[in-house]
Amino acid sequence: MKKGVMSAISMLMGATAGAGVVGKVQGDKLKITKDMSAKHLKLFLMMNQWVKVKQEGKNLSTYFENKGYKRIAIYGMSYAGETLVDELKDTGIEVVYGIDQNADSIFADIDIVTMDDTLEEVDAVVVTAITFFGEIEEKLSGKLNCSIISLEDILYEV
């Protein structure tokens, strides 16, 4: 009888612990999914603003010229970074290099380095990874003596 009761109690404890673990894992997955969703929404809204800027006949090179930025670097060389490089081609703005944590796997028309590399001084760094702008700005400020600007801010200011 004692064995049966102990077995039943052990089974209930195991089921409870298992349910708790499954709930925790599912909760973690849900948080990751929500974070990714928010990140992609911000990216979509930024790119939508860029389309509006282009529809108004504006070019981002004007922003940099008005600020006196001739040589820039771009942090975040995914879609937005590549698009910015393309937009600034054949303008008076030189994109000196890109910065990306996945520098080894990115192929671009400019040099791509990581934050750990020695960063050449430029007039400004444009951060395309807008979700993490605060963290990136803090790290870059310790390595460079230049303006660090969010691409999102540029798009709403131009």
List PLM regions with ranges.
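Hydrophobic, well-ordered beta-alpha structural blocks that scaffold small-molecule cofactor pockets
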Residues: K2-V158
